[in-house]
């Protein structure tokens, strides 16, 4: 089974089979990225636009590299240098992009639901590169790809801890929805004000402290405080205090399984949610995540382009 839809909006709507399709498809592109000539012409004659209404380093650059390695014509759109500053609506911006016969729009927007809104109103294919606190599907797919690459079997015997500002994290939501499709055992831990009020919808274990979250985990996914989404308004005394109770350090990682791996979607706040001795240590696969992001995004763009014919 492949993926036959026009857009990629979130992992909540994906089936287990569709997720596996993307993970398998990305293998070909990972091999290409490791070769001397990192390019093919699968998207020759296609146009992609990276429309980012929020700042981004890894995601925007990754999608740009992915499109160019597939041979597409790629344009980067920044809302701060566009007619958005003159009051143009998202709907009008998307329609104007589509009117230029754009094939794929990669959209990041501060409003939850923006990607679905845009996809329903444009003929171009839309990839959700993060919409508010809602979802970030390509990050979840690259996380699962990274888990498999490091020998983790995606089933009920896999213990994954997600720790940090879960309430404001679109990465956490996409990871959770994707991992639930495989029956993965999820443990969640966050400061009380950073745990979603409706956390029970995730049907996951809610941990009381870092030690419980780390104990016996195969995978630990650390999340930063989402300062730009109100995380700065949550009361905690200092970065040092946060690190003391909610940070991952070399002592806490010892509670996890010996072959446990540590993930982080970036950017890292070193000394806050993650100490440098862990971020740069043997358990960390953070840079591997970044590397795998290109392959996953190549698989996404190639699939949506093929679906368009």
From Swiss-Prot:
<feature type="binding site">
    <location>
        <position position="59"/>
    </location>
    <ligand>
        <name>carbamoyl phosphate</name>
    </ligand>
</feature>
<comment type="function">
    <text>Catalyzes the condensation of carbamoyl phosphate and aspartate to form carbamoyl aspartate and inorganic phosphate, the committed step in the de novo pyrimidine nucleotide biosynthesis pathway.</text>
</comment>
<dbReference type="Pfam" id="PF02729">
    <property type="entry name" value="OTCace_N"/>
</dbReference>
<dbReference type="InterPro" id="IPR006131">
    <property type="entry name" value="Asp_carbamoyltransf_Asp/Orn-bd"/>
</dbReference>
<comment type="pathway">
    <text>Pyrimidine metabolism; UMP biosynthesis via de novo pathway; (S)-dihydroorotate from bicarbonate: step 2/3.</text>
</comment>
<dbReference type="GO" id="GO:0016597">
    <property type="term" value="F:amino acid binding"/>
</dbReference>
<feature type="binding site">
    <location>
        <position position="266"/>
    </location>
    <ligand>
        <name>carbamoyl phosphate</name>
    </ligand>
</feature>
<keyword id="KW-0808">Transferase</keyword>
<feature type="binding site">
    <location>
        <position position="58"/>
    </location>
    <ligand>
        <name>carbamoyl phosphate</name>
    </ligand>
</feature>
<feature type="binding site">
    <location>
        <position position="170"/>
    </location>
    <ligand>
        <name>L-aspartate</name>
    </ligand>
</feature>
<dbReference type="GO" id="GO:0004070">
    <property type="term" value="F:aspartate carbamoyltransferase activity"/>
</dbReference>
<dbReference type="InterPro" id="IPR006130">
    <property type="entry name" value="Asp/Orn_carbamoylTrfase"/>
</dbReference>
<feature type="binding site">
    <location>
        <position position="108"/>
    </location>
    <ligand>
        <name>carbamoyl phosphate</name>
    </ligand>
</feature>
<feature type="binding site">
    <location>
        <position position="139"/>
    </location>
    <ligand>
        <name>carbamoyl phosphate</name>
    </ligand>
</feature>
<dbReference type="GO" id="GO:0006207">
    <property type="term" value="P:'de novo' pyrimidine nucleobase biosynthetic process"/>
</dbReference>
<dbReference type="GO" id="GO:0006520">
    <property type="term" value="P:amino acid metabolic process"/>
</dbReference>
<protein>
    <recommendedName>
        <fullName>Aspartate carbamoyltransferase catalytic subunit</fullName>
        <ecNumber>2.1.3.2</ecNumber>
    </recommendedName>
</protein>
<comment type="similarity">
    <text>Belongs to the aspartate/ornithine carbamoyltransferase superfamily. ATCase family.</text>
</comment>
<feature type="binding site">
    <location>
        <position position="86"/>
    </location>
    <ligand>
        <name>L-aspartate</name>
    </ligand>
</feature>
<dbReference type="GO" id="GO:0005829">
    <property type="term" value="C:cytosol"/>
</dbReference>
<dbReference type="InterPro" id="IPR002082">
    <property type="entry name" value="Asp_carbamoyltransf"/>
</dbReference>
<feature type="binding site">
    <location>
        <position position="224"/>
    </location>
    <ligand>
        <name>L-aspartate</name>
    </ligand>
</feature>
<dbReference type="InterPro" id="IPR006132">
    <property type="entry name" value="Asp/Orn_carbamoyltranf_P-bd"/>
</dbReference>
<feature type="binding site">
    <location>
        <position position="267"/>
    </location>
    <ligand>
        <name>carbamoyl phosphate</name>
    </ligand>
</feature>
<dbReference type="GO" id="GO:0044205">
    <property type="term" value="P:'de novo' UMP biosynthetic process"/>
</dbReference>
<comment type="subunit">
    <text>Heterododecamer (2C3:3R2) of six catalytic PyrB chains organized as two trimers (C3), and six regulatory PyrI chains organized as three dimers (R2).</text>
</comment>
<dbReference type="InterPro" id="IPR036901">
    <property type="entry name" value="Asp/Orn_carbamoylTrfase_sf"/>
</dbReference>
<feature type="binding site">
    <location>
        <position position="136"/>
    </location>
    <ligand>
        <name>carbamoyl phosphate</name>
    </ligand>
</feature>
<keyword id="KW-0665">Pyrimidine biosynthesis</keyword>
<dbReference type="Pfam" id="PF00185">
    <property type="entry name" value="OTCace"/>
</dbReference>
């Amino acid at each position: 089974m492949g993926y036959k839809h026009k857009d990629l909006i979130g992992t909540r709507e994906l089936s287990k089979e569709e997720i596996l399709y993307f993970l398998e498809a990305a293998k070909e592109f990972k091999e290409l990225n490791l070769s001397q000539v990192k390019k093919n012409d699968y998207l020759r004659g296609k146009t992609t636009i990276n429309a980012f209404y929020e700042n981004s380093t890894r995601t925007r650059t990754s999608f740009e590299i992915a499109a160019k390695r597939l041979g597409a014509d790629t344009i980067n759109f920044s809302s701060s240098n566009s007619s958005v500053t003159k009051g143009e609506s998202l709907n009008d911006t998307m329609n104007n992009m589509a009117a230029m016969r754009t094939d794929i729009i990669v959209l990041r927007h501060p409003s939850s639901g923006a990607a679905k809104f845009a996809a329903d109103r444009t003929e171009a294919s839309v990839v959700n590169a993060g919409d508010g606190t809602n979802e970030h599907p390509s990050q979840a797919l690259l996380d699962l790809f990274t888990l498999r690459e490091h020998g983790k079997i995606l089933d009920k015997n896999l213990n994954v801890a997600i720790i940090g500002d879960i309430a404001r994290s679109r990465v956490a939501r996409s990871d959770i929805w994707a991992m639930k499709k495989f029956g993965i055992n999820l443990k969640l831990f966050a400061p009380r004000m950073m745990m979603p009020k409706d956390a029970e919808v995730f049907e996951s274990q809610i941990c009381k402290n870092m030690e419980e979250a780390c104990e016996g985990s195969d995978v630990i996914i650390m999340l930063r405080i989402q300062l730009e989404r109100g995380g700065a308004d949550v009361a905690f005394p200092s970065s040092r205090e946060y690190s003391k109770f909610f940070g991952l350090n070399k002592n806490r990682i010892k509670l996890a399984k010996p072959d446990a791996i540590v993930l982080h979607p970036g950017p890292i706040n070193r000394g806050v949610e993650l100490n440098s001795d862990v971020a740069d240590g043997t358990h960390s696969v953070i840079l591997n995540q970044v590397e795998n992001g290109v392959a996953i995004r190549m698989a996404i763009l190639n699939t949506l382009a093929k679906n368009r014919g």
